[in-house]
């Protein structure tokens, strides 16, 4: 999985801010022909330290992705007080076969997973960083 470093840094900063109030950042992973971006959604959960991707946001992002020739390939969320490893609730709520990226809000550490048959399997990821060139 190739992730945009600038995009991930922005989401990690948002995760740190939300963690101050026991909130989690969450959203969808959108694959644009090999480059995956994290697209934030509203967190519909009313409980601290939990997330629920807003269904209307999910639908809108999925429709926009299809129009652009992209596709939703998974979800992401932050953990405030634990390693970026899927817990039992994360696995139960996951879409079978989708990727899941978890960010540690405190450290910015990120890990990618694939959820299949009730189990989490670690995915390799790397970052793409764009270089600005002078004209």
Describe every region a protein language model picked out:
Residues 1-72, 80-135:
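Conserved beta-strand-loop surface patch within small alpha/beta domains used
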């Amino acid at each position: 999985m190739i992730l945009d470093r600038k995009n991930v840094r922005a989401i990690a900063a948002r995760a740190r801010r939300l963690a101050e109030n026991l909130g989690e950042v969450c959203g969808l992973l959108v694959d644009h022909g090999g480059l995956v971006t994290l697209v934030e959604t509203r967190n519909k959960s009313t409980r601290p330290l939990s997330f629920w991707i807003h269904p209307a946001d999910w639908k809108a992002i999925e429709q926009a992705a299809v129009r652009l020739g992209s596709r939703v390939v998974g979800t992401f969320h932050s953990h405030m007080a634990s390693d970026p490893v899927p817990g039992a609730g994360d696995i139960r709520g996951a879409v079978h076969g989708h990727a899941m990226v978890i960010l540690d809000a405190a450290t910015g550490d990120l890990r990618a997973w694939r959820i299949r048959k009730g189990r989490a399997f670690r995915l390799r990821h790397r970052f793409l960083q764009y270089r600005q060139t002078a004209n």
